[in-house]
């Protein structure tokens, strides 16, 4: 979205992961390069 784009700019909220969650994400990523949104949400909200 450029500065001249019409309409309100909606930014996605970033998820802050704990160190333990990052380790789990890295393990998952090792086996599967793409983590579905559902899986990321599951890992973010234990």
Swiss-Prot record:
InterPro entries: HD, Homeodomain-like_sf
Single biological process term from Gene Ontology: embryonic skeletal system morphogenesis
Disulfide bond entries: none
PROSITE patterns noted in UniProt: HOMEOBOX_2
A GO CC term attached to the entry: nucleus
Keywords: Developmental protein, DNA-binding, Homeobox, Nucleus, Transcription, Transcription regulation
Subcellular location: Nucleus
DNA-binding region, residue intervals: 1-46
GO molecular function, one term: RNA polymerase II cis-regulatory region sequence-specific DNA binding
PANTHER family: HOMEOBOX PROTEIN HOX-D3 (PTHR45664:SF5), PROTEIN ZERKNUELLT 1-RELATED (PTHR45664)
Function: Sequence-specific transcription factor which is part of a developmental regulatory system that provides cells with specific positional identities on the anterior-posterior axis.
Family classification: Belongs to the Antp homeobox family.
Protein name: Homeobox protein Hox-D3
Organism: Ovis aries
Gene name as annotated: HOXD3
């Amino acid at each position: 979205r450029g500065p001249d784009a019409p309409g309100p700019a909606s930014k996605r909220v970033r998820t802050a992961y704990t160190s333990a969650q990052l380790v789990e994400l890295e393990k998952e990523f090792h086996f599967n390069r793409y983590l579905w949104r559902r899986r990321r949400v599951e890992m973010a909200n234990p």
